[in-house]
Amino acid sequence: MRPGRPLAGFYATLRRSFRRMSKRSKNKAKKERVPVEDRPPTPMPTSQRLIRRNALGGGVRPDAEDCIQRFHPLEPALGVSTKNFDLLSLRCELGWCG
């Protein structure tokens, strides 16, 4: 703000700019919006994937998560589908992997 300009003038300018912004219609705002649907989904980090994705629906037990990270470290990185990853985490949960 310039020296010597009263604060009331600043607030008047602020009010005018808010009034101009509120006159933008909802349709115009929708047209200006960048569509997100065309963008590919952000890949989830492996640590979160282990917690969220398993056949039992909850988190993977710590010993099973340790088993997945120690004995199957490349499988999530190679693009294992979520169904196969669920089966892998279930095998580790039940102690069937060897």
UniProtKB/Swiss-Prot annotation:
Biased composition (Basic residues): 19-31
Region (Disordered): 19-47
Family from the record: Belongs to the lymphocryptovirus BNLF2b family.
Protein name: Uncharacterized protein BNLF2b
Source organism of this protein record: Epstein-Barr virus (strain B95-8)
